[in-house]
From Swiss-Prot:
<dbReference type="InterPro" id="IPR004399">
    <property type="entry name" value="HMP/HMP-P_kinase_dom"/>
</dbReference>
<feature type="binding site">
    <location>
        <position position="45"/>
    </location>
    <ligand>
        <name>4-amino-5-hydroxymethyl-2-methylpyrimidine</name>
    </ligand>
</feature>
<dbReference type="Pfam" id="PF08543">
    <property type="entry name" value="Phos_pyr_kin"/>
</dbReference>
<dbReference type="GO" id="GO:0009229">
    <property type="term" value="P:thiamine diphosphate biosynthetic process"/>
</dbReference>
<comment type="function">
    <text>Catalyzes the phosphorylation of hydroxymethylpyrimidine phosphate (HMP-P) to HMP-PP, and of HMP to HMP-P.</text>
</comment>
<comment type="similarity">
    <text>Belongs to the ThiD family.</text>
</comment>
<keyword id="KW-0547">Nucleotide-binding</keyword>
<dbReference type="GO" id="GO:0005829">
    <property type="term" value="C:cytosol"/>
</dbReference>
<keyword id="KW-0067">ATP-binding</keyword>
<keyword id="KW-0784">Thiamine biosynthesis</keyword>
<comment type="pathway">
    <text>Cofactor biosynthesis; thiamine diphosphate biosynthesis; 4-amino-2-methyl-5-diphosphomethylpyrimidine from 5-amino-1-(5-phospho-D-ribosyl)imidazole: step 3/3.</text>
</comment>
<dbReference type="GO" id="GO:0008972">
    <property type="term" value="F:phosphomethylpyrimidine kinase activity"/>
</dbReference>
<dbReference type="InterPro" id="IPR029056">
    <property type="entry name" value="Ribokinase-like"/>
</dbReference>
<comment type="pathway">
    <text>Cofactor biosynthesis; thiamine diphosphate biosynthesis; 4-amino-2-methyl-5-diphosphomethylpyrimidine from 5-amino-1-(5-phospho-D-ribosyl)imidazole: step 2/3.</text>
</comment>
<protein>
    <recommendedName>
        <fullName>Hydroxymethylpyrimidine/phosphomethylpyrimidine kinase</fullName>
        <ecNumber>2.7.1.49</ecNumber>
        <ecNumber>2.7.4.7</ecNumber>
    </recommendedName>
</protein>
<dbReference type="GO" id="GO:0009228">
    <property type="term" value="P:thiamine biosynthetic process"/>
</dbReference>
<dbReference type="InterPro" id="IPR013749">
    <property type="entry name" value="PM/HMP-P_kinase-1"/>
</dbReference>
Length: 269
């Protein structure tokens, strides 16, 4: 009988299916890894926007984590939207009793319109309780600014931001350069800072509005590859290659920013 690596996503639910838990489980399935989930909040959203965010109780979040702990052998996991300080503290405390393997944190903190999704208390909890325990952080540029106060716009400022993140206990990070008005050239750069290497992943930009869930999908692809035995550097590089293929092959669903086309990478995994 074939054994499938087991992974976990701790994140919010997207009723539109393009981001959050739904995007994570689709990415896991594409890789042939078995995805489990802990839902932190329910969102009412579609391709045109988020219409409501409803955090779950800390009791329900804790119960989900412990249920996964008691029955599954998790090889790697990711965290996405954690909603508020209470849920962040709950997750941090519960994880101290778990062995879920390597952790990828996609710090969902800033909305597309630039509004902060986490209050200051929650950001402080995230910095103190979760950043030092994370094996890989995958922030976009607005999230880098929220965490460090540094506007990362080029190699020098990205390196400066990483210095601040390292002071906060971050070991490895992918600073994603595609989520900003400042980069509208032919290529988009992601800055990768690992404990033993630093490099840039550059990919051609594509003219598409169907990019909802790119951050969730990238972190989930990395988790799936880690669970299959790749090291961090190769998992990040391969995930970026796959995400580029996905964006090249848009999925026209809904009337706004459509979801990603995970079917497009079936033959590449």
């Amino acid at each position: 009988m074939k054994v499938y690596p087991q992974v976990l996503s701790i994140a919010g639910s997207d009723s539109g299916g393009g981001a959050g838990i739904q995007a994570d489980l689709k990415a896991f399935q594409t890789f042939g890894v078995f995805g489990t989930s802990v839902i932190t909040c329910i969102t009412a959203q579609n391709t045109q926007g988020v219409h409501g965010v409803y955090p779950l109780s800390v009791e329900s979040v804790k119960a989900q984590i412990l249920a996964i702990r008691d029955d599954f052998s998790i090889k790697a996991f990711k965290m996405g939207a954690l909603c508020n300080a209470q849920i962040i503290e709950c997750v941090a405390n519960a994880l101290e009793t778990c062995d879920f393997g390597l952790c990828v944190l996609d710090p969902v903190m800033v909305a597309k319109n630039g509004a902060l999704l986490l209050e200051e208390e929650a950001i402080l909890s995230l910095k103190k309780r979760l950043l030092p325990k994370t094996n890989l952080l995958t922030p976009n540029l607005p999230e880098v600014y929220a965490l460090t106060g540094v506007q990362a716009r080029d190699d020098k400022s990205a390196s400066k931001a990483m210095g601040v993140l390292r002071d906060l206990g971050v070991k490895n990070a992918v600073i994603k350069g595609g989520h900003t008005e400042h980069f509208q050239g032919e290529f988009s750069n992601d800055w990768v800072f690992l404990e033993d290497a630093e490099f840039i992943l550059s990919a051609k930009r594509f003219n598409t509005k169907n990019t909802h869930g790119t951050g969730c999908t990238l972190s989930s692809l990395i988790v799936g590859l880690l669970a299959q035995g790749l090291d961090l550097k190769n998992a990040i590089t391969k995930a970026k290659e796959l995400l580029t293929i996905i964006i090249q092959n848009p999925l026209n669903i809904g009337h706004g920013h459509g979801p990603l086309n995970l079917w497009s990478i079936k033959k590449h995994v």
